[in-house]
Every structure is written in C-alpha cells, then in structure tokens.
Amino acid sequence: DVYKRQKNPEREIKEIPGYKYKDVYLYANGKPQELDGAYAVDPTHPSSEAMMKRTSELFHRAGFEYVKMDFMTHGAMEADKWYNPEIQTGIQGYNYGMQLLDKYFGDMYINLSISPVFPAHYAQSRRIACDAWNKMKDTEYTLNALSYGWWQDKVYQFNDPDHIVLRDATDGENRARVTSGVITGIFIAGDDFSKGGSKEVKEKAMKYLTNAEINAIANGQSFHPVDGNGEKSENQ
C-alpha cells in the first residue's frame, strides 16, 4: 500500500537513494502534516523534483499524453519550514512545486484532483469534487458539486466529474451517472476495458458511452443551475 510505504519515516525513497521519507515530510509543530491518510511532502525538496523528473521520463517513454495528479492539496499545506528558505507559506510552496510540474509535464494534458482551486494556470482540468463512483448517491454528489462549482470551467478549460464507472450498477444508475458527467462538460470512462475486463461492463459501455447525440453535449462547457440558491444538499 502506497500510503503505508509513504508513512514509514525510516523507509528509503526507492527512486531517490540517500533520502528517507522523513527527510521530505512537511512538519507543523514538529509533527508530519497528515491529511486523508497520507503525509504531505515538501514540494521544494530536491527529491520531489527528482521524483517528478523520473516519473515524467517514464511517462514520456510510454507515450502518455494525459496525467492525473491526485492529492494536490498536500503540497499547499502550511509547515514550520520548507527546504527552500525563500518559501514562507503553503501556497508559495504549492506554486514552487507546480512550476516544477509544468517543467516536466507541461506538454501533457494535466488533470488535478483534490487540489486548491487557485492558482489555476498549471493544468487544463480539475476534478469538480472528490471521488464519485457508480451509484445514485454519486450522481447526486456530482450534481451538487456542479450546482455550486459550474463556474470553474471559466477558470480551467474543463470541469472533471470523475471517472464514469458502470460496473456493479443498475441501468438507471448508469444512465444517471453518464448524464451527470455529460452536463459537467466532459467524462472519462473508468472501467477496466482490458482483455481481462468484464464482458458485461464492455457491453454496458457500448450501450451507454457510444450515443453520439448524448456525447455531443459533452463539449467542455458545464451546465448552469436554474436555481443556485438552494439550502439543501444531496439526499435531503
């Protein structure tokens, strides 16, 4: 588990020999900054750039043109200090790290997840909320995020409604989830379409993801809510 490896302070960073994870944590009051089960790392530490460079080289060799960057908020967390003494705030650290990201991945389509809304000029798209899967509650969650976050497609090129997952869901749930993605502006298929993937899921995908008239609606623009002043959220 990547979280368990990353949260072992004495573990050497495999990709960057000579550094241990404890060397790159962001500390507040002497303790590692933790959020959502993972420790934040210092974007100004040399090992952070080295890992970006190494990963970028791998992705470019493999021919990838798209990269999803997750848990970006960790890079904006406040700390007692940063490796680079010129950095004094979390957002300064985030900007520093994002400039490196642009340096190594700037020729790719970058999709940010769990990230600050601003600064926004380092990526083409940003996930409009957190994880949304395949059930009706996930559709409700996405629509709630769209109701109050539609304007972000004026900040980024695209709002990302999270991957559309069809497996283990009813036809009605599939249709609703596809709709929630289409009206957000784009959607990304999230099931396993490899040779070993589920035949049922592939059939569902052919049924729900190949409707030309529906797909034409997903043109990168988010729908605007008729009423944006509601007082209740999903499931209420």
How would you describe each model-predicted region?
Residues 195-236:
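Non-catalytic C-terminal accessory modules of carbohydrate-active enzymes
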Residues 77-91:
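Active-site cleft segment of glycoside hydrolase catalytic domains centered on the general acid/base Glu
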Residues 8-15, 79-83, 122-124, 203-205:
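Short secondary-structure transition/capping segments
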Residues 73, 187-188, 211:
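Short hydrophobic/aromatic residue motifs in ordered secondary structure
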Residues 52-81:
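Active-site groove signature of glycoside hydrolases
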Residues 2-3:
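Short, small-residue-biased leader/transition segments that mark boundaries at the very start
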Residues 11-50, 54, 92-199:
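Glycan-recognition surfaces
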Residues 7-8, 73-74, 117:
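Conserved beta-strand edge residues that scaffold enzyme active sites
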